[in-house]
């Protein structure tokens, strides 16, 4: 029989090694509150690691400008990107999409011009000067023929364009824009309804991690089926799942 000390050490090592050997993937994150925040209590701060854990992985998020994040993920500097629309692999061939949506984004217009008509689609913004975040490909493509596009690197710069009256409208996620407006007391900024477009958002991994794509998709489906996804949404988001204020 092994001495008790040796046995305890072996058991201790056995409990440490699996955790230490779990692969960690670093993904770029272009989200803001209420999806992700500095305290890591946002919806995607919680549902992302939950899915990765079920797939036998650890997730660490870093926040880079959207365009740089895509380039770095495609180059393998980071291991992927947390939320992008389908089709990114067409222009970033080293990225592989996890074929189970992570979340829905409602791309919306915000303005402090009270004379603007309500947009029902991207074409309604084409006669305007519009601010968008560099690297948000859906906005870059749909507004390519707009009167003028002003590109910025982050949400603070985006809404500053409105404050300085440099643009007629900006495009952002509906939920994140509403949170930002409330948090920063932007009383003159209004959300234009309905949203320009609702799109499914997906995790992308660099092709060197292709073996994790199927397990991650299965893990996402599992946490939706067992109620974990809906519970984390209720606990983290100020708006009902599939709804809004």
Model regions and ranges:
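Extended ligand-binding regions for polar small-molecule ligands
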Residues: 45-54, 113-119, 123-129, 203-239
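Periplasmic-binding protein-like
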Residues: 29-30, 103-108, 182-220, 239-245
């Amino acid at each position: 029989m092994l001495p008790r000390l040796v046995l305890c050490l072996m058991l201790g090592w056995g409990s440490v090694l699996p955790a230490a050997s779990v692969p960690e993937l670093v993904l770029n994150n272009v989200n803001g509150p209420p999806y992700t925040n500095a305290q890591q209590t946002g919806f995607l701060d919680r549902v992302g690691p939950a899915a990765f854990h079920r797939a036998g992985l650890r997730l660490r998020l870093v926040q880079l400008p959207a365009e740089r994040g895509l380039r770095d993920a495609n180059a393998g500097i980071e291991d992927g990107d947390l939320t992008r629309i389908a089709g990114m692999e067409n222009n970033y061939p080293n990225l592989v999409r996890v074929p189970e949506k992570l979340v829905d984004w409602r791309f919306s217009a915000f303005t402090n011009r009270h004379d603007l008509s309500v947009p029902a689609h991207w074409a309604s913004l084409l006669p305007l000067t519009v601010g968008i975040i560099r690297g948000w490909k859906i906005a870059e493509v749909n507004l390519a023929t707009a009167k003028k596009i002003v590109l910025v690197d982050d949400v603070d710069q985006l809404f500053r364009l409105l404050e300085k009256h440099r643009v007629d409208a900006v495009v952002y996620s509906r939920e994140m824009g509403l949170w930002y407006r409330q948090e920063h007391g932007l009383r003159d900024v209004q959300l234009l309804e309905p949203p320009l477009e609702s799109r499914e958002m997906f995790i992308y991994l660099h092709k060197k991690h292709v073996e994790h794509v199927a397990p991650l998709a299965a893990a996402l489906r599992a946490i939706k089926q067992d109620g974990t996804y809906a519970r984390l949404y209720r606990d983290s988001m100020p708006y009902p799942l599939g709804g809004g204020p």
